[in-house]
Structure formats: C-alpha cells, structure tokens
C-alpha cells in the first residue's frame, strides 16, 4: 500500500463528521477515531512501516521509540516491529503496584528516543509524555504522529524543544479519498 492509498484508507476507516469534544476540550465538526485505524491490521502494519521510515529519516539517532498509553502503544509496537527499534510504554501516571513505573520497558539514561503519537491537536498528552521521558533521563527531540490536526500542537511541541513530523494532515486526508465521511451516531 503506497502513502496515498494508506491516507485514503485512513480517512475511509477513521474520519467521522458530527459534533465532537476533543481531549483538549475543544469542539470539532470532525473526529479521527484512532481506534478505527489502530485495530485494523491492514492499516496498522503500513502505518508502522511509514512511522519507522519517518523516524529513520528525521531522527536517525533514535535507539528507541516511545508510545503514550493507550492510543499510541499499538502504533509504537507496529513501528518497533518494522524498524527493529525497541519501544517504551509511557503511562499517564506511575502505577501504584508492582514496579510502580511510569515508563515500561528497558532503557539506559541518555538514550535518544522518538515519541510516537496517534492524533495531535494541542499536544497536551504528547508534552506530558515528553516530560516523563526527560525526567527519566532520556533525550527526546522528535515526535512522529499519524495525523496533525494543525491546531497548535506542532507549535506547543516546538516550545518544548520537540519537532513534530506528521504522516498526514486532515486537509490531505480529505483530498486523498473521494468517499463520503461516515456520519457519527
């Protein structure tokens, strides 16, 4: 599946129109349902390959990937399988049992990590993940997301010293597919 076919399939599977409240609290007339594309092997595999290629091109010094729970874990795993780079799971908060870790996986202080994200709007969750990785002594300079909604997330990440590399943007997804968006509900 080439990039254009992947974008068209992504839109066909995950682009919904309606009235939605986003994680950021903003309202939107469209929604990209990440679980509709992260749970379909025909999309998850090619997305993992494209994320791996993007990491190789834009963050070649990365020795590890990191995916925030819950949404980006499947993407980080797919990119890990494609790239051969191990990955970390970034919890929203440290668990209160077992090892009490916020980061799951093995790593060494000072390693360069590339953050993998699903859909970026304001980048609030991505910045929280970057902060957790940095607090653990890891270096983060790049984040790769499937879709940048172009609503300030790239600028917010830049202020945190992280470059955002998006595989797709909403306007591009709309141009790649001729089929009608699925109504929500």
Regions found by a protein language model. Name each.
Residues 1-116, 120-185:
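PRPP-associated nucleotide enzymes
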